[in-house]
From Swiss-Prot:
Record GO cellular component, one term: nucleus
Keyword Ribonucleoprotein recorded: no
Lineage: Eukaryota, Viridiplantae, Streptophyta, Embryophyta, Tracheophyta
Assembly mode: The nucleosome is a histone octamer containing two molecules each of H2A, H2B, H3 and H4 assembled in one H3-H4 heterotetramer and two H2A-H2B heterodimers. The octamer wraps approximately 147 bp of DNA.
Residue spans of biased composition, Basic and acidic residues class: 1-32
Description of post-translational modifications: Can be acetylated to form H2BK6ac, H2BK33ac and H2BK34ac.
Protein name, per record: Probable histone H2B.2
Keyword line: Acetylation, Chromosome, DNA-binding, Isopeptide bond, Nucleosome core, Nucleus, Ubl conjugation
Family of the protein in this entry: Belongs to the histone H2B family.
Gene3D superfamilies for the chain: Histone, subunit A
Amino acid sequence: MAPKGEKKPAEKKPAEEKKSTVAEKAPAEKKPKAGKKLPKEGGSAAGEKKKKRSKKSVETYKIYIFKVLKQVHPDIGISSKAMGIMNSFINDIFEKLTQESSRLARYNKKPTITSREIQTAVRLVLPGELAKHDVSEGTKAVTKFTSS
């Protein structure tokens, strides 16, 4: 008599095999979701070292907004939500100015965007008094930069 752990499966008859192939479908395999990655089999080898991913540096104007706020109103703070809105506002204005200045450079068939194109873009993008103040502040900044 064979030990209990070693039972041999009974042989199937050829007639039963034909019925099972026609009647049964192979179970559908589940595909892993696109967002999740399966871990690699075998783990990490002894010779392999994992490379650390460096974080992408996201440039914001938050520190500069805060510095200007403290110059203008030293006693007033700003919430993180308001800071995010101000950062988005500055990014939007800079985007508009760069688009306009590049368009001006293309119209004049110039390969370089100079302070003149930026100044004209400021006059076109920003309204009235704001444009005048920005042009004067920009001119002051450029003269300070060139003199130093």
